Amino acid sequence: MKNPSVISFLIILLFAATICTHGNEPVKDTAGNPLNTREQYFIQPVKTESKNGGGLVPAAITVLPFCPLGITQTLLPYQPGLPVSFVLALGVGSTVMTSSAVNIEFKSNIWPFCKEFSKFWEVDDSSSAPKEPSILIGGKMGDRNSSFKIEKAGEGARANVYKLTTFYGTVGAIPGVWLSAPQLIITKDTAKTLLVKFKKVDDATTATSNLYFPG
């Protein structure tokens, strides 16, 4: 028989998860289906005049050193990006909800560079980080700087458009060092906010299988 204190803790955890998700709604992919932690997705910026490329990929954001990698939008419109999966912070359920903490991890069997780093996203919260810190690869589940939230950013025809937020600010994009490919950063400037959609990998016709270095 399980210890009563353990059972009480599990009940409290489930109750807390219910409270945290009350009033939230499932995040939808481009087909209108809820995001599921068992599936993989391409994160694709909404196309604009200044952002007409493909999906998000890990890439070097400095000339030297290359590591840790950052995240950029591929300049090639036909490249869907590199797949990601989502891990719920509370570990309860499998549907990704708006305003709920998640960890984001790139999924790839081919990872030729920076193998000493994890594939989880994180905010550069180091003392040397600029005012608008970069999103890097090398995060750790449970760490404050590896926690992201998906917030609704569109209605009507743009109902399945979202933005990513963190404890430090909103995920945005600025011209990067390689051919000015949009690079992900944290910003409080709404003009730089990156609007994205999620495309299930099974629904895509092609996939990026290698790390992408603009240039």
UniProtKB/Swiss-Prot annotation:
SUPFAM superfamilies: STI-like. Disruption phenotype: No visible phenotype under normal growth conditions. Glycans are attached at N145. The keyword Ribosomal protein does not apply. It holds the Pfam family Kunitz_legume. Expressed in vascular bundles of the carpels, the transmitting tract of the style and septum epidermis. Expressed in etiolated seedlings. Residues 1-23 form the signal peptide. GO terms for molecular function: cysteine-type endopeptidase inhibitor activity; peptidase inhibitor activity. It is found in: Secreted, Cell wall; Secreted, Extracellular space, Apoplast; Endoplasmic reticulum. The keyword Phosphoprotein does not apply. GO terms for cellular component: apoplast; endoplasmic reticulum. GO terms for biological process: defense response; programmed cell death involved in cell development; regulation of pollen tube growth; response to herbivore; response to insect; response to wounding. InterPro entries: Kunitz_inhibitor_STI-like_sf, Prot_inh_Kunz-lg. Gene3D superfamilies: 2.80.10.50. Disulfide bonds join C67-C114. It comes from the Eukaryota. Keywords: Apoplast, Cell wall, Disulfide bond, Endoplasmic reticulum, Glycoprotein, Plant defense, Protease inhibitor, Secreted, Signal, Thiol protease inhibitor. SMART domains: STI. Its main location: secreted. Coiled coil: none annotated. Water-soluble and chlorophyll-binding protein that probably does not function as a chloroplast chlorophyll carrier and is not involved in photosynthesis. Involved in the control of cell death in the transmitting tract and septum epidermis during flower development. Binds and inhibits the activity of the cysteine protease RD21A as a pro-death protein. May play a role in herbivore resistance activation during seedling greening. Interacts with RD21A. Interacts with RD21B and RD21C. Belongs to the protease inhibitor I3 (leguminous Kunitz-type inhibitor) family. This is Kunitz trypsin inhibitor 2. It comes from Arabidopsis thaliana.
